[in-house]
Amino acid sequence: MAKIQLRNIGKSWGSFVGVDNFDLTIADKEFLVLLGPSGCGKTTTMRMIAGLEDVTEGEILIDEQVVNDLDPKDRDVAMVFQSYALYPNMDVYENIRFPLKVRKTPKAQHHERVMKAAAMVELEDFLHRKPAELSGGQRQRVALARAIVRKPKVFLMDEPLSNLDAKLRVSTRAQIKNLSHELQVTTIYVTHDQIEAMTLADRVVVMNKGIVQQVGTPTDIYDNPANTFVASFIGSPAMNLVAGTLEAGIFKTQNMEVSGFDRFPDGQVTLGFRAEDAKVSSSAAELNIQVYSLELLGDSTMVTARVGESLVAVKAAKDYSVAIGASVGIHITASICHLFDTQSGQRFKEN
């Protein structure tokens, strides 16, 4: 098992900065998710940890040892890729066994370790099939077993569910969560999918344009986003964000007025609130809108309206019904809201 320390690491190509001043300690046995949009630097960060990319600045330590100059094979990490990376000429058994042969593990251990890894991902009945005879989910499980059989200090998983359909993603996600609990190996997982991040992680690192935006537990990041980028990236739907003016403790914008912000400074601000925290009303309220769309989600109905240049979503009961274009009120209180500085995007903390 291993603790990983990233000491102000950075990666640049000429004037382009891919990862900037990334500083973090990852605890032994922690499941850490690097989350962000394409091009944010999350995969580059993982590749630096693996040794597949050189570090431009800073240090990477695994178990207190600086590994900047170590080859990937000497870092004792195992990677699982989006593309599975299986050998088509080998059956499942030999694909799983291959890392043991490369690392010259005593042959007497091979069969037991392969069978144990295969059992963990429920592949015992597929050991003599070639990759072409497997489904996408089964291939990804072979890739997981091949990483498990190594018994590495660290698992690195780069968008391992991206090629799977929605149903397989759910079941494989649950399997990864279960394996993490069973194996107790430090794991770094890269994804652009905030649902994967929220369901799998002990902690989430949200990245954008090579910069860490926030580090915290999934609950922390959902309930207390550090800035408007995190607020708009986490949640389905994302947090509602409405620009307006704060004066004498009252937030005002088109068709909207919310009081109770006396401890915040006056100025141009952005109000944020979650869809499930506001309430739809047939009478006048803090926000008065015309319904833009209704979406039945099964357990609830999503009511969407336009406020200025923003779309605002609010969850209502599953049997809620109203005509498109009808006027409704949305009850919002200061206690469910966050205020962000409109210029910097940073969330205000109470004075």
Q: Where do the model's predicted regions map?
A:
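ABC ATPase nucleotide-binding domain
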Residues: 5, 25, 61, 329-331
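Pre-Walker A (P-loop) beta-loop-beta motif of ABC nucleotide-binding domains
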Residues: 22-33
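ABC ATPase nucleotide-binding domains
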Residues: 31, 69-229
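The feature captures the beta-strand-to-loop junction immediately N-terminal to the Walker
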Residues: 35-37
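Helix-to-loop junction immediately C-terminal to a conserved catalytic motif
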Residues: 50
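ATP-binding/catalytic-site motifs of ATP-hydrolyzing domains
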Residues: 59-61, 65, 211
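ATPase nucleotide-binding modules
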Residues: 226-271, 276-292, 305-322, 351
